[in-house]
Amino acid sequence: MRPTGWRWPVLSLLLVLLPFQAAGPPRPRAAWTRIVSFLTCALTALAASWMTATRTLSNEITHCLTLTRLFRRYTIVNSWLLDRSLREAVLPSKTVTRMAIDQLWWPRKYTSTNGTIWCWGGGPSGISCRWIRINTCASCRTADPSGNARVYTVARPQPPTCCSNGRPRPLFRTFRYRTLPYLINPKRANNGAGPRQRFRNVYPPRLATVSLGRDGNGPVRGISSSPTRLTRPRMGGNTLRVSRTFGPVPCIVPEAKPWTPRVKRRCPLGATSRRLRPQARRGNVCACVVENGYGTAGYVPAAARCRLVRPPVRSTTRFST
């Protein structure tokens, strides 16, 4: 549809005002540079979509927004452009939709009329998006029976656990750590690989995570290129190292059951298997305890420099093995 008459000034005004619909104060670093880059890209996309009918205008502007990295500082709520393009791209997919968008290295949340869309990833593999329905009730619900997208209802008053068959599961998700040093506790240079794995500066607190170390088989060891599946890592040695990729994550339960990798050593640093809780013990595996923002405990595979840290006494999160 070509803009004629009053549509041209309205669309031009929309392109100018769209980057300023911010949910919070913008960062002062290179703010005008990114806005000018977005306007240049958006005007080019508008002219291209006006002359050719190959792509829709909403997809072009969405691509310009992500390409100029305005999502790092701006959260556009209930935008018809993002709502339309992302819902069309995410909801019909049964797995994970990947779009060829570079330079987006952090999960972003887009609030639409039907729920919340989380996008994460970046680099050569592209960006992945998921639609998650948020509910304010305290009860735990199962997945959406439609099966188009693995939709889970998250209970906000409770700790961040996804629901599967009415039972909560611990939330372990991995994202790349690149340009967000403020998420890591500056008092611990090893980033949680020491005796006490506590992360006080993780934002937001209800979405803490831990990953398993890097590998050539994917972005991180133990996590394949698809964020919804867990794969067995290639064991290069007898220990696993906890990498430095921590950050907020969407509450998505992997399709496969939680898998705990085995190590040849019985327990690191003299820890014995009888000191472990039954939920964390599988054969000769020693697990370390990581606390998320709410203080509830979760178990990760044993690391070479990791000691056993007992979980809080009052822990409301149930772990399914």
Swiss-Prot record:
Region spans: Disordered: 210-237
Highest taxon of source: Eukaryota
Residues glycosylated per entry: N114
Subcellular localization(s) per the UniProt record: Secreted; Host cell
Protein name according to UniProt: Secreted RxLR effector protein 71
GO cellular component, one term: host cell
Family (UniProt): Belongs to the RxLR effector family.
Range of residues in the leader sequence: 1-23
Keywords: Glycoprotein, Secreted, Signal, Virulence
Sequence motif: RxLR, positions: 84-87
UniProt domain comment: Has the canonical translocation RxLR motif, but lacks the canonical EER motif, which characterizes most oomycete effectors identified so far.
Function, in words: Secreted effector that partially suppresses the host cell death induced by cell death-inducing proteins.
Keyword tRNA-binding carried by entry: no
